[in-house]
Amino acid sequence: MKLAKRVASLTPSATLAITEKAKELKAAGHDVIGLGAGEPDFNTPQHILDAAIKAMNEGHTKYTPSGGLPALKEEIIKKFARDQGLDYEPAEVIVCVGAKHALYTLFQVLLDEGDEVIIPTPYWVSYPEQVKLAGGVPVYVEGLEQNHFKITPEQLKQAITPRTKAVIINSPSNPTGMIYTAEELKALGEVCLAHGVLIVSDEIYEKLTYGGAKHVSIAELSPELKAQTVIINGVSKSHSMTGWRIGYAAGPKDIIKAMTDLASHSTSNPTSIAQYAAIAAYSGPQEPVEQMRQAFEQRLNIIYDKLVQIPGFTCVKPQGAFYLFPNAREAAAMAGCRTVDEFVAALLEEAKVALVPGSGFGAPDNVRLSYATSLDALETAVERIHRFMEARA
């Protein structure tokens, strides 16, 4: 059957593709270490699991309002006030089936055919695909490695055209782990305000920061920036709830209303049980969040030091999220590979280590390595990469 043109140009997720390949090799009996996962390796905290069981036992298994349970919206509003000093009303918040769905719904209600969305590179793999599905045009602005993968106000200004509708800011970043400072965000925000460009602020990794770095939301810097920003967030990364699929968006009422109307015709509502679990995530103890953050920071410090000792790898030390994003161009050449993609494929085939090629993130010289797995597995993986390089060099 002939499929719709809008899906013909879709690029499959690089992260999911490598994860599936690793699973296939494992199923065939190979000892594969997968470092492609974009999710914490910890279980969801117990008080959240208990809240979900309680909700089921109390019969909270029916439809909810399309925009989310009022009680969950209230907890999200309290979270914004507590963490960023931001004041939102229920009509300015929508609960979605994960942060990915919040982004998808936002672009569907925001973009007309040919509207442009500025996407800094390296980027999360789904940004350009979601923009294209909504009829939009991704416009890439390169975040240079020597600038810690951050874009400058001058770069942003040069990329804006009469068709520019929005810019995506992802801090802490997937895949690089970089974090914009308040001063850097303010400078980018001033450009957006001057040109009437909506800011889409993806803050899903906000709780995962290291080395004293702090997450700042661009919306908290001024009332004007708040009015021109849609924040995307969720409980997936902070509370190890990736499979529960609860994310949300907060922003101008007209945008949130349009998103809610669209959601009523697509998903009806996020899963009721997961919403009750998310209420417990935000209203309950936050110690598990900090414990996970500390574990990730310990892994980062150990594995970063080991990785940069491998010939051919250079890496900007990340300040957040749970990924390393080293430049592997020289390593690939030393291993006799023409491209980094070929290098990643050889690593999986010969060393049984699954990394994600940076080409899927708009950075073909890099690879993404997730440290959201056990320290033993990480150290073994780096040892295998080292041995692979020694054998190939």
UniProtKB/Swiss-Prot annotation:
Subcellular localization: Cytoplasm
Catalytic reaction(s) noted: L-aspartate + 2-oxoglutarate = oxaloacetate + L-glutamate
Enzyme Commission designation: 2.6.1.1
Key word Cytoplasm present: yes
Positions of modified residues (N6-(pyridoxal phosphate)lysine): K237
Keywords: Aminotransferase, Cytoplasm, Pyridoxal phosphate, Transferase
Reported cofactor(s): pyridoxal 5'-phosphate
Pfam families from the UniProt entry: Aminotran_1_2
GO MF annotation list: L-aspartate:2-oxoglutarate aminotransferase activity; pyridoxal phosphate binding
Gene3D superfamilies membership: Aspartate Aminotransferase, domain 1, Type I PLP-dependent aspartate aminotransferase-like (Major domain)
Biological processes per GO annotation: amino acid metabolic process; biosynthetic process
InterPro entries assigned: Aminotransferase_I/II_large, AspAT/PAT-like, NHTrfase_class1_PyrdxlP-BS, PyrdxlP-dep_Trfase, PyrdxlP-dep_Trfase_major, PyrdxlP-dep_Trfase_small
Superkingdom in the source lineage: Bacteria
Top-level class of the enzyme under EC nomenclature: transferase
PROSITE patterns: AA_TRANSFER_CLASS_1
Gene Ontology CC: cytoplasm
SUPFAM superfamilies documented for this protein: PLP-dependent transferases
Annotated binding of L-aspartate, by residue: G38, W124, N174
Subunit structure: Homodimer.
Family: Belongs to the class-I pyridoxal-phosphate-dependent aminotransferase family.
Protein name: Aspartate aminotransferase
Organism: Geobacillus stearothermophilus
Gene: aspC
